[in-house]
UniProtKB/Swiss-Prot annotation:
This is UPF0298 protein SUB0431. GO terms for cellular component: cytoplasm. InterPro entries: DUF2129. It comes from Streptococcus uberis (strain ATCC BAA-854 / 0140J). The keyword Amino-acid biosynthesis does not apply.
Length: 85
């Protein structure tokens, strides 16, 4: 049966927008900001390190950053009254 894969967001900063098509083979591109020259894409979590290394080796990629969505607190109720850690 089908098993759900854990996905992670990845932000890829480019030097030029014309190179955005070349990144499509590394994962599922969700958003392309032409003004900011970056792509938001999703890759499988078990392939994250490998994909980041491959992307950072490319000449047209300025930087590849993994999303910190899993690391932040998702309990928004009462954030103002909670003590800072």
């Amino acid at each position: 049966m089908f098993e759900k894969q854990k996905r992670v967001g990845l932000v890829v900063y480019l030097y030029y927008n014309r190179d955005a098509r070349k990144v499509h083979k590394y994962g599922d591109v969700y958003y392309h900001s032409k003004k900011g020259r970056y792509l938001v894409m999703y890759v499988n979590q078990n392939d994250l390190e490998e994909k980041m290394k491959e992307l950072q080796k490319l000449k047209f990629v300025k930087e590849a950053v993994a999303s910190a969505f899993d690391e932040i607190d998702h309990q928004f109720v009462g954030n103002l009254h909670r003590e800072a850690n």
